[in-house]
From Swiss-Prot:
Subunit composition and interactions: Monomer.
Gene Ontology molecular function: chitin binding; endochitinase activity
One Gene Ontology cellular component annotation held by this UniProt entry: extracellular region
Biological process terms in GO annotation: chitin catabolic process; polysaccharide catabolic process
Every GH18 domain range: 23-314
Keyword Signal on entry: yes
Protein name: Class III chitinase ARB_03514
Family: Belongs to the glycosyl hydrolase 18 family. Chitinase class III subfamily.
Organism: Arthroderma benhamiae (strain ATCC MYA-4681 / CBS 112371)
Length: 330
């Protein structure tokens, strides 16, 4: 996609998908998430690459946002009013819009202290969460548009993320205007090196978008026709969901490259991915499929619709697709 304005073209294609409130159906198992989305329920915008960047405000980079976004003076925080309008349009069509924090270029390393972590969560909430009249001076990239939550995607060592994530959850719970979601995108080796602190530290996630690619546990090592899988380790993540997670109802999503060029390894064709979906559906924690990313899926024919069809056939619901245009780390 050449411009973030085209988020609306994805929605037009996928408007036929029926969802529960705000797109993400936490109890369901047919969600499709895409980094942005079509035949899709959840759209994480990737990425916020800094929580406290130049000027003391967050920094966002959507890679190919182009002319519609201009930085606020003295900062690297982009003002993207068109994206704000698109967010509201997507939400009216039942899509869940998340902001993904981190990615391959995130280099802050987390926070120096728990107090800094809480302050960072408050800053993100003021910047992207509900509009408060008491915070009229806050710079808001999407103007009065309010995202539906945050996705945490850290690919290097980060500190004090438990108090950060818990503060986000506290802010969610105190806000009664709508439901907000907290998700994460760990790599498939368990325990994930960079997210272990959060995953095993009492943070209540609504869904985990497991990256089953670029690793030995990737989708390319799924054995067709086998009832047990030695390398593809969805079963291990299902065990985490039921026995370790602070939220025993957390949904585990199968993360897949949306095209051959989307990841270094792990891409499988739609027919094979359907087999993975059918096998994964036997686990109660299964929540759907995540694809990286929208631009790759868009160029891959009927890949997304085939996946959505497989999910819908068994009353599985979420497809999550991310939009970033380009991300060297995936």
């Amino acid at each position: 996609m050449s411009s973030v304005k085209n988020i609306l073209s994805f929605v037009a294609l996928f408007a036929g998908v029926k969802t529960a409130y705000a797109g993400l159906n936490s109890p369901g198992h047919n969600n499709v998430a895409i980094y942005w989305g079509a035949d899709v329920d959840v759209i994480p915008l990737a990425f916020a690459v800094s929580i406290k960047g130049p000027g003391g405000v967050p920094q966002i980079n959507f890679s190919n946002q182009g002319d519609p976004c201009k930085p606020f003076p003295g900062t690297d925080l982009l003002h993207c009013p068109q994206i704000g309008e698109d967010i509201k349009t997507c939400q009216k069509k039942g899509k869940t819009i998340l902001l993904s924090i981190g990615g391959a270029t995130y280099s802050e390393g987390g926070f120096r202290s728990a107090e800094d972590a809480v302050a960072g969560a408050n800053l993100l909430w003021d910047t992207f969460g509900p509009v408060k009249s008491s915070n009229s001076s806050v710079l808001r990239p999407f103007d009065d548009a309010v995202i539906d939550g945050f996705d945490l995607d850290f690919e290097a060592t980060v500190l004090n993320m438990v108090p950060f994530a818990k503060q986000l959850r506290t802010l969610y719970d105190a806000e009664k205007s709508k439901t907000f979601y907290l998700t994460a995108a760990p790599q498939c080796p368990y325990p994930d090196l960079y997210n272990k602190e959060m995953l095993e530290g009492g943070v209540k996630f609504d869904a985990l978008f497991i990256q089953f690619y670029n690793n030995f546990c990737g989708l390319n090592n799924f054995v067709l026709g086998s009832q047990s899988q030695d390398k593809f380790n969805f079963a291990e993540w299902d065990n985490f969901a039921k026995k370790v997670s602070a939220n025993p109802d957390v949904k585990i999503m199968v993360g897949a490259p949306a095209n051959k060029g989307a990841a270094s390894s792990g891409y499988i064709d739609a027919q094979t991915l359907v087999s993975v979906i059918n096998w994964s559906k036997t686990f109660s924690s299964f929540g759907g499929v995540m694809m990286w990313d929208a631009s790759q899926a868009w160029a891959n024919g009927n890949f997304t619709s085939a996946v959505k069809g497989a999910l819908s056939a068994g009353n599985s619901r979420v497809v999550r697709m991310s939009y970033a245009g380009y991300h060297s780390g995936y």
